[in-house]
């Protein structure tokens, strides 16, 4: 098959969704398919070809002003027409492709354009949903970036914008609400017109059921490349001394990632952490609060800010425990998938799709409250054999559920069913 992967997030400068798209591309290439990533590139002009870590890539240039909401229109509605034309051109270029074409959109910015192109050339279109973009303009599913809520409406946006942007900027943004709601309608329309929609977890699938009929909705997890991770983690991390035992937190220092809960956890578990350093790999608005918590409790801490992806993997492979106190509806955390591949003992809060990865007491530990989290953390810090056993089983689960061959086979079956 010839598989076109439009994606607005792609390595090297991206988060988990971009790396998931790249892992999918490599897995499909390894199984003999022709794969081309199609990536919008702000600030460029025209169309350029290249390669991104062994994945053939077509970059589609566009420009967007820095004016709020006008910028979003330029990055989406105005871009979709040009991007759809490019996708359609690539799907019908027989000098490049001779087998049947499948268009698999990887994220929100490209999904409507993929549907437009698919309708134009008669190719099946699949859309992967990896976060909350179908029902939340900001894709977090959090009102004011703090409180989970089901969907955005006039009333919710009127309070969300001031909570998110501040009173003055929020008030100035209120006239943009009609555009925001219309933009959400475009996103949902793309999902309704797609040949199939893939949810990365049961949690996201449940959220999508009101938008997508059951026969078009499929739960297929993201891929984690075990072989590549093994090669990377064969080298120790450079940001922490080899003889220093440490507990690890990786992520944005924001409320949705549970950074505010980490302050409470450190206060309650400071005695248990005396033999360990708490390594915090990430940055964000709550960094100062965490620094104050470390100073008050006298817990040894290393703030690494942002680190490259390989170093993050090496840290996970060598830490005694990964803390994941996420406070939002995690779609399917790439950090947790990669932690399983690294045999990392994980302590997490069971939000969103996390239970699809971590089974409490089998390949990790789950705790629903801060006191319960602290209790399990103290237990695991004092039980190295238990930690090792959880890490071994985590790797086994990654091999059974998230390995490239396992997930790519599920996608092949779906693609073939749509081409019949």
Task: Name every feature range the model reports, one short phrase each.
Residues 105-110:
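Short His-centered aromatic/hydrophobic patch
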Residues 133, 149-196:
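Membrane-proximal helix-turn-helix segments that form the acceptor-binding/catalytic region
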Residues 203, 223:
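Carbohydrate-associated surface elements
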Residues 386-401, 407-413:
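A short, well-ordered alpha-helix in the C-terminal region of glycosyltransferases
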């Amino acid at each position: 098959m010839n598989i076109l992967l439009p994606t607005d997030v792609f390595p090297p400068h991206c988060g988990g969704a971009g790396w998931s798209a790249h892992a999918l591309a490599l897995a499909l290439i390894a199984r003999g398919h022709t794969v081309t990533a199609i990536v919008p590139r702000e600030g460029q002009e025209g169309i350029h070809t290249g390669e991104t870590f062994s994945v053939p890539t077509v970059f589609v240039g566009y420009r967007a002003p820095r004016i709020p909401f006008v910028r979003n229109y330029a990055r989406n509605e105005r871009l979709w027409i040009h991007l759809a034309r490019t996708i359609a051109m690539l799907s019908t270029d027989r000098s490049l492709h001779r087998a049947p074409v499948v268009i698999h959109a990887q994220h929100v910015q490209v999904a409507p354009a993929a549907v437009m192109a698919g309708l134009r050339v008669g190719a099946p279109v699949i859309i992967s949903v990896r976060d909350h973009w179908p029902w939340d303009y900001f894709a977090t599913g959090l009102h004011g970036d703090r409180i989970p809520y089901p969907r955005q409406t006039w009333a919710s946006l009127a309070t969300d914008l001031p909570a998110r942007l501040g009173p003055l900027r929020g008030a100035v943004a209120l006239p943009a609400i009609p555009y925001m709601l219309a933009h959400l309608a475009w996103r949902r329309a793309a999902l309704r017109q797609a040949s199939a929609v893939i949810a990365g977890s049961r949690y996201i699938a449940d959220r999508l059921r009101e938008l997508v009929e059951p026969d078009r909705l499929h739960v297929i997890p993201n891929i984690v490349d075990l072989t590549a991770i093994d090669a990377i983690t064969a080298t120790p991390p450079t940001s922490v001394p080899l003889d220093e035992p440490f507990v690890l937190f990786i992520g944005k220092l924001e409320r949705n990632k549970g950074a505010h809960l980490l302050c409470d956890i450190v206060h309650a578990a400071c005695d248990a952490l005396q033999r360990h350093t708490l390594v915090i790999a990430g940055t964000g608005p709550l960094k100062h609060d965490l620094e104050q918590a470390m100073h008050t409790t006298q817990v040894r801490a290393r703030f690494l800010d942002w680190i490259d992806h390989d170093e993050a993997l090496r840290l996970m492979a060598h830490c005694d425990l990964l803390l994941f106190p996420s406070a939002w509806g995690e779609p399917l955390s790439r950090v947790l998938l990669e932690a399983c591949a690294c045999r990392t003992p994980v302590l997490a809060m069971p939000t969103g799709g996390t239970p699809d990865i971590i089974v409490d007491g089998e390949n990790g530990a789950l705790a629903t409250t801060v006191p319960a989290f602290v209790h399990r953390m103290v237990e695991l810090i004092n039980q190295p054999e238990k930690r090792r056993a959880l890490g071994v089983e985590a790797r086994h689960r990654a091999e059974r559920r998230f390995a490239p061959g396992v997930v790519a086979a599920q996608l092949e079956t779906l693609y073939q069913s749509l081409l019949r």
